[in-house]
């Protein structure tokens, strides 16, 4: 006569980390659910912080004139226009006239706020979906303004602007703000739960 045994599984203990989404609220998908390896989550967090520097450094340099790409007398706070000069004289390719027509104080503000907003979102790990759209638009415009498809460019298809856009997509889809960031708490806010595009 054979005996059968019944295996019972204990419910996951939220305090032990067995239920990744439990800490952020029931039904909420977190990075632990999407990226299962801890090392991968940490690598994505490093990439996110590196991406933050890509946006925040030019913002600070153009605002203060730190002497790297922007000399002190060309700082925004010194009265210079961070985007106008480039749009009027630095754009290459067939869209040069279009970009020159866009030059003005409004584009200066949009450019600087874009750098600051996307950089802070990446640094804090919140609002990555909005940041990805804004960052992709900003870097897409920069790609068009440099027109790398012209002869003599380093790479006519994928340059640093395209790589940053791809990085933003990866960081957003892997919920990279949850590790070493405020993404998990941000996602649990009632407003963000009602409007997931804010995540």
Which residues are covered by each model-predicted region?
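Extended, low-polarity transmembrane helix blocks
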Residues: 1-89, 94-117, 124-199
């Amino acid at each position: 006569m054979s005996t059968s045994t019944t295996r019972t599984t204990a419910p996951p203990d939220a305090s032990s980390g067995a239920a990744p989404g439990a800490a952020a609220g029931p039904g909420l998908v977190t990075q632990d659910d999407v990226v299962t390896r801890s090392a991968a989550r940490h690598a994505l967090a490093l990439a996110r912080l590196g991406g933050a520097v890509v946006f925040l450094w030019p913002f600070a340099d153009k605002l203060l004139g730190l002497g790297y790409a922007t000399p002190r007398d060309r700082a925004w706070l010194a009265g210079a226009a961070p985007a106008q000069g480039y749009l009027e004289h630095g754009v290459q390719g067939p869209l040069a006239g279009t970009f020159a027509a866009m030059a003005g104080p409004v584009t200066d503000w949009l450019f600087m706020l874009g750098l600051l907003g996307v950089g802070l979102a990446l640094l804090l790990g919140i609002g990555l979906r909005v940041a990805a759209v804004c960052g992709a638009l900003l870097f897409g415009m920069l790609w068009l303004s440099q027109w790398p498809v012209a002869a003599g460019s380093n790479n006519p298809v994928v340059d640093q602007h395209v790589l940053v856009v791809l990085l933003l997509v990866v960081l957003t889809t892997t919920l990279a703000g949850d590790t070493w960031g405020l993404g998990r708490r941000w996602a649990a806010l009632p407003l963000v739960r009602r409007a997931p595009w804010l995540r």
